[in-house]
Amino acid sequence: MVAAPPDAGSPAVRRVHRPRADCTTDSAGGLTFRVRLCEGADEEAGAPEVPESAAVLLRLRHQHGPDASLRLPLARAAADGRLQASLPSTTRLREGRWDAYLTLGDEEPQRLLPGVHDLRSLVGSASVDTQAWLGVRIPYTTKYGNLAVRTWLRRPHAEAGALRVADDAITLQGRLYGARLSATACLEAHPRDAAASSVRVPVRPDSEERSEPQAAAPEHGTDTGHSVRDFAAELPLGSLLPGHRVWDLWLRPAEDEEPVRLGRILDDIPDKKRVFKYPSQRVTSRDGAAHSARPYYTINNNLSVQVSVETLAEAEAE
């Protein structure tokens, strides 16, 4: 139980300064916050008293409504004054970026700073059970140095794996969760503008064994009627020519089913765009124009392909 302060103006309450949270993920998809209320000289002075209503407050960035904020009650966890709050794997969070705050009664919530994170469960070798929903939460440091949690909630989900750019094609391995691959399954490239038509290529079962980190299935439990399926596909880059446009990649499990956005979320990297860099491949269209094609991950960790028409200077520099 968190102790109540003598009064709202007590020195103990005022000692809360630059609160910081260590985060630990578990294999079920839960997330634990261990909050230090002060640091440096303030920390050595002893643990501040905080109200019983103390909580970690998560706010979904740029969103409003009852499902855009969540309070996680804090309880005293250790003699050193740290407080602990838990986000269970069964708690359903909307997909997005959740900013983390410390709230103490009627006081204005304070932004939490990031501490030491233990995310080993996100990159473990345990097999992922078949799930109706995949819920992923990754704590990270924002560009302003604050703590936030990146979340995904998808059903079904197509997880991108090994990707190779060579021989005028993108060769891709992946895994489908929450649905079955049929004989009519295909990889689709959808242009972001209406000037071009979608491109389809067949996918084939991939027998190469791979392991993925475990993810949570909020609320809905295990769907034994659907199973994990590995797949592989080859997308000829020439099929994305000519023009200058972006193509988004989707997996259609069966001809009569809706496509599933292809992405990569089952690890400890919240922003793939800055980390995963793939080489550009030079491709020539039928009219002889040189193009550059490069796969990349979007800000939401979805997989896309950027196709650009090379300028004369770029072509001559080759």
Briefly describe each language-model feature range.
Residues 1-318:
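Basic, ligand-binding patches in group-transfer machinery
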